[in-house]
Amino acid sequence: MFTLNENEREYRFGESGPKYLMKGPRMNFAVVRFLPGEDFQAHYHNVMEENFFILEGKVDIVVDGKKNTLSIGDFIHIEPGEVHYVKNAYDAPVKMVSALAPFQEVDKVCVENPVY
């Protein structure tokens, strides 16, 4: 058992990106923040499934070519093998929770970003 406050961790890109509160041994759990106009490279996972829950703002998550516009309170589940691309195309930051399982040290395969 452990506890931690998100302020004890830093976002990967300074003010944005993922902020991992836990990496392994069975799952990853992160708070993710994207500023207006920011995106995250399209990719898929061979083994891990990924879930996002929106805490603040609005975001587009394209899964296998289908655009999903999500806002506060929305949840999306992404299966292994489904290509997903995250973009904040809006005028305010988005903050969301990301949970991936089962934990794999290396399981991200980058692909070309979709045009939408």
What is each of the regions a protein language model found here?
Residues 1-28, 108-116:
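A short, N-terminal "cap"/entry segment at the start of jelly-roll beta-barrel domains
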Residues 25-27, 47, 91-92:
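Short strand-connecting beta-turns/loops that link adjacent beta-strands
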Residues 30-45:
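Conserved short histidine dyad/triad with adjacent acidic residue
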Residues 39-41, 60, 76, 80-86:
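Histidine-centered metal-chelating micro-motifs
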Residues 47-49, 54-59:
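Glycine- and acidic-residue-biased ligand/ion/polar-headgroup-sensing regions
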Residues 65-80:
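Short acidic-glycine-tyrosine-enriched beta hairpin
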Residues 80-106:
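Ligand-binding loop in jelly-roll beta-barrel domains
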